[in-house]
């Protein structure tokens, strides 16, 4: 029997929940209250996308993710603005069970390799815009990634 998860998504910009990857209008909810609502509603996992533009905003979002993890009991995964292995570490140390690496970035395989060696492949996910990545990197995917997120 297949196991299905109900997953909620939070998009973070400047430490606040916004409406989407391309819509930075605030959701109108405090992000901690939103995460608690998901936690109390039977959601299995929250995926958080860090939409930061610079290191200062990235650190603010990491701090927000750490606060979310302190306030929920469900799995939290995060990704976004990952350009080096240290960014993966920041998400893990903020309490995320899994980290999402962007498959479209040229250095994603190097980051994933180092992260899966350090933290285990079950903690590393890859996001792609289309399934071409899967066919081009099939061996590496099995070795370094636990799940695939197709964002379309």
Please give the residue ranges for each predicted region:
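Glycine-rich phosphate-binding active-site loops on the catalytic face of alpha/beta enzymes
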Residues: 90-111, 149-152
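Short, well-structured alpha-helical patches and their helix-loop capping segments
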Residues: 104-107, 116, 133, 140
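C-terminal helical cap(s) of enzyme catalytic domains, especially alpha/beta-barrels
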Residues: 110-122
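Conserved N-terminal beta1-alpha1 strand-loop-helix module at the mouth
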Residues: 1-74, 82-86, 90, 121-126, ...
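Conserved phosphate/oxyanion-binding catalytic-loop motifs
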Residues: 78
